Design a protein with these regions (language model features):
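N-terminal interaction/assembly modules
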Residues: 1-96, 147
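Amphipathic alpha-helical interface surfaces
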Residues: 78-82, 101, 133
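Mid-sequence acidic-hydrophobic segments that form the walls
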Residues: 85, 108-111, 140, 144
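Short amphipathic alpha helix immediately N-terminal
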Residues: 94-115
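Helix-turn-helix DNA-binding module
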Residues: 111-128
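DNA major-groove recognition helices of helix-turn-helix
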Residues: 130-144
Length: 148
């Protein structure tokens, strides 16, 4: 279970890149089709035409719907669970120490041979405490992703 959670954590940068690309694609997409006309007072106005597949003619609403649909995808849910688990690391510690611990656990999970406890220099946290917190983080990821 922890090994599967470790692979999920190692895939986090790829999921985040994929998510950012999808959001950029949605936000950068062209607007909806519209018809422009002149009102009696000489003011110009637009009427947005309904899009294909039942989408609204409002470009902002269409983009919101697309982002909502994106948030319901499996890889985005997994990405969110891992982010929540990272935020939960070291909740009982002062902020600076908590950030150092989050960074250290992140690096250790990415490459445990290169970033061992001794090389990470996490002040105020002992070796056994570090690995206990790392295991708790991976268990949190596993639980959040439904591996148990």
């Amino acid at each position: 279970m922890l090994k599967a959670a470790l692979y999920i954590v190692r895939g986090q940068p790829r999921r985040e890149r994929r998510y950012r690309d999808a959001v950029e694609e949605i936000l950068g997409a062209g607007g909806a089709q519209y018809a422009e006309y002149t009102m009696r007072g000489g003011e110009k106005a637009r009427t947005y035409l309904p899009g294909a597949k039942g989408k609204t003619g409002n470009p902002t609403a269409s983009k919101v719907e697309a982002i909502d649909a994106l948030e319901r995808l499996g890889y985005v849910k997994t990405m969110r669970r891992v982010q929540e688990a990272y935020e939960a690391i070291g909740g009982d510690l002062p902020e600076k120490m908590r950030q150092d611990l989050q960074r250290a656990i992140s690096l250790n999970c990415a490459d445990g041979k290169r970033y061992t406890y001794e090389r990470l220099n996490v002040g105020g946290i002992g070796r056994s405490d570090f690995y206990t917190r790392r295991a708790a983080f991976l268990a949190d990821v596993a639980t959040g992703c439904g591996l148990e």
